[in-house]
């Protein structure tokens, strides 16, 4: 299908109003979006590097790279503007050896970018997103969330 779609990892909790992001998707139907939040932990995140402090992505990496620091850590919420284009990009990615020994969803955006597609970030607030993929993350979330 050439319809847009969203893929969300299962190891995080989101509590944010998506109205702004939905408007961006509607206003820019040929753009794909990746949500990010400010974090620098290279052991837990992929990163979206943007051009000149804009929302336009020029590269996604599993680690921050020398000479290209960023704190745009991906959240695991991935929007693709076109399912057919997504499939083509995934097939290109899978035809290459995996970076760091495994494939990452964020790397699909590099294939989109290489083929001239528009990829943008949408920043979310740290108080509306909690990673829960490790025991430490889960304990942090439950301690903060259930003490409200």
Which positions does each model-derived feature cover?
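Catalytic-core segments of class I nucleotidyltransferases/pyrophosphorylases
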Residues: 56-130, 136-148
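Short secondary-structure transition/capping segments
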Residues: 19-20, 132-134
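A polyampholytic, Gly/Pro-enriched intrinsically disordered region
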Residues: 1-6, 53-54, 143-146
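Anionic-ligand binding region
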Residues: 30-73
